[in-house]
Amino acid sequence: PFFFNDTATTEIYTLSLHDALPIFLASAANWVVLVCGSEGYGNYRHHADIAHAYQIVKAGGVDPDHIITMMYNDVPFATSNPFPGKLYNHPGDDVPDVYEGVVVDYEKKEVSPENLIKVLTGDESTGKKVLKSTKEDNVFLFFSDHGGPDILALPGGYLHSKDLLDAINTMHEKEMYNKFVLYIEACFSGSMFLKLPDNLNVVAVTAANDQESSWGWYCGSEAVVKGKSLGTCLGDEFSVYWMEDADKGEQKTETLDEQFKRLVKGVTKSHVMRYGDVSFKEDVIGEFIGYPKSRNAVPYQHSFEQWDSRDNEMLFRLYMAQHTTGKEQKKWQQLYEEEVASRKAIDRYFNALAKEAKYYQMPEPVENTECYARAIKQFEDIMGRSDYSLKYFNVFANMCNENPLAFSGY
C-alpha cells in the first residue's frame, strides 16, 4: 500500500501528468474478458483470434487471475486441424502457436449469454471466475463470433443488445470499472451499441457498422502454416489488424484514438465504428491490455483471399472438397451440397415470410426484444440454427418494430 502525507501529495501534483500517472494507478488493476462465441472447425478464426488476444494481455502483465476466457474449445482438437492442440492466427513458416498456455474458464455450452452477463456483473452463482473489478480498475472485453441485427451469437443462445446494455448499466451502478473498452468482431456489430450512452466511461469499437458483414482474413489457399493448408480462415480482418498492431509493443505510446484511426484506415472490407464515451480516447491502449514487449511480432499483410463471414462455412466446405481426394473428397462434396441446400431453404423461408421489400431494409434499433426473440426461436425450431440465416434477421426486427405482437401465436 502507498501512504501519502500532505507534503508528498503536494509534491506528486507538481509532477507532470505522464510521470504521476503510474503512481496513481499503482493500486488499480486490469481485468480482461475474452469471448469466442462459435464452434466448429469452419469457425477456426474466432478461436485463433481469442487465443491471440490471450497471449497479448498475458504478455502485457495482466494478472492471469484477471483474465476470463470463454471459448467452445473444440477447434484446437478437431480432426480437421492439421496441428492438434495448436492454433495459428497468421500464415507462414515461423509463426507462433497462439493456443499455447491459454486457460479456458468457460467452455462448450457454458459459453452462453446468461453466463457472459454473470461474468460482467460479478454474479458468482456460476461457481466460476467472474469480474471482481472495482471503480479503480479498467476492464477490456474482446468478443469474436457471428452477429446479426441487435444480437451476438453464442453456442448457448443469442446476446441481445438490451441485455448487454443492461449489464453495462449494472456494472456502472456497482462501480465495477474506472473505464471499460469493448472490441467486437461480428457482423452487424455496430447494431449492439446504437443506444450506448456517452457518459458512462464506456467505449465500444466494432468491426462493422450496424448494416454489414465483417470478414474472415487469411482464408482458403492463403491459410497455410508451416507448409500445411488449414483450409479455412486463420483470423478476421478487424481482429488481425488490431492484434498485429498490438504485437508491435507500442502500448505505452499508442492511444485508443490512434489505434481506432489506424483500424478505420486499415480495415478495408467493413466500416470500423466507435460508440459511447470518447472522453478518454487519448488514454494509451496499454492501460487496458497491458504493456507487452514485442512478442514475435509478425508484420501485418493484406490478405488476398477474404471470405464474407456469412459465406465462411460454405466456402470452407467447398475448399475442402476441391483439395481432398477419395473418400474425403466425397465427404466434403456432400457437406458442401448440404450447406448449399440449407441456404436455399432459408432463402425460400424468408421469401415466403416477407414479400414486401420494406422488411428487408436495415431496421432502426430493435424496439421489442421479446418479439424479436420469439421470431428467432420460431424460425430455428423449424429450420435449425445457421450462421447464414443471421443475414435475414433484420426481417424479424422490422416486423416486430411494426407489430410487437407478431409471432405471438407460436
What are these regions (language model features)?
Residues 24-410:
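Cysteine endopeptidase catalytic domains of the caspase/legumain-like
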Residues 7-21:
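Short, small-residue-biased leader/transition segments that mark boundaries at the very start
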